[in-house]
Amino acid sequence: MNNIKRFLLFLLLLFLMPIIIGQLPFPNNEHLSVQVPNEQQLVYASSNLVMPSKRVLLAFTHSHEAYRPIVEAKSGKKQVDSHNKINIFSLRQMLEEYFSFQGIEAESIDVDLAAENQAQGRSHSQAYKTARTFIADKIAMDQYDLVIDFHRDSARKKTTTLTEGGVSYAKVAFVVGLEHPMHTWNLSYAEQLSQLMNELVPGISRGVIKKEGERVDGIYNQDLSKEMLLIELGGIDNTEEELTRTSAVLTEAISKLLDSQ
C-alpha cells in the first residue's frame, strides 16, 4: 500500500513540476518569447538596382532650341523652332532619369541659359560665354566623369531621323571644337561614344563634326574639361518619342564607356 502511495505521489509531482517552475522568480520570466523572423521583413537587393558611382553634368547652352512636333502637340503652334518653355531644356528630367536607370548620377545646370544670355544683353552668338561661367563654377565645386552640353540640330528630318526595325530614332551628332589644346581628348571621347552608340543601334550616330575657322566658335567651352562633349540631340522635326528612344541608347552607351575607363 505504501509503495502505491509513493508511486501516485511521484506521478503528481511530475504533473505539477512545469507549473511550479513557471512560477519561479527568474528575471523577466514572464516576458520571455522566441523571436521568429518575419519573412515579409526580409529585403533582397534587386538585380536591376545599381548604386550610382559615376557623375555627369548636363548643360543646355541654347536652352530655347525647340522641336516642332513637340511644340505643336503641346501648344498648337506650328513651325516653331525656338520656345521659352517647350524646348530642349525641358527634356532635362527625362535625360536625368535615363542616366539614373544606368546607375549614373546626372545633374543639370538648372538655369535657363538662353534667358540668362538675354538678360545680360548678349547676342545668340555669345551664348557660350554666358554658359561658360555656370559650367566652370560647377566643375570647380564638384567632380564629374563627363560634362555634356545638349543642343538641337537645325537639320531636317531626313538627316536627323533613323528608322531601324520599324522603330524611329532621333539621330545624334557630336561637335568638337579644334581651337583649344585639349581638343584631342574631346575628339577621342566623342569618337568612342559615337562608335558605341552605333554598335547598339547601327546608324543612330551621325559621327563627329569638327569645328574651326571663321564664323564658328571653335571651342564650345570644351577647354574646361577633356571629358566634355557637345551633343546634337536630334533636329527640329524629331518627335518626343524619337528623342526618348535615343536618350535610352545614349545613356546606355555612356554607361558602357564610363565603365571601361
Which residues does each PLM region occupy?
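Second-shell loop/turn segments in exported
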Residues: 77-86, 95, 117-126, 175-184, ...
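Active-site histidine-acidic residue metal-binding/catalytic motifs
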Residues: 51-122
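Hydrophobic membrane-insertion alpha-helices, especially the h-region
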Residues: 7-23
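Active-site microenvironments of hydrolase-like enzyme catalytic domains
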Residues: 134-177
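Active-site-adjacent substrate-binding region
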Residues: 184-210
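Active-site-adjacent mobile loop/cap segments within catalytic or ligand-binding domains
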Residues: 208-261
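Solvent-exposed loop/turn segments at secondary-structure junctions
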Residues: 63-66, 112-116, 152-157, 179-182, ...
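N-terminal, intrinsically disordered, polar/charged segments of Gram-positive cell-envelope systems
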Residues: 18-57, 65-68, 76-79
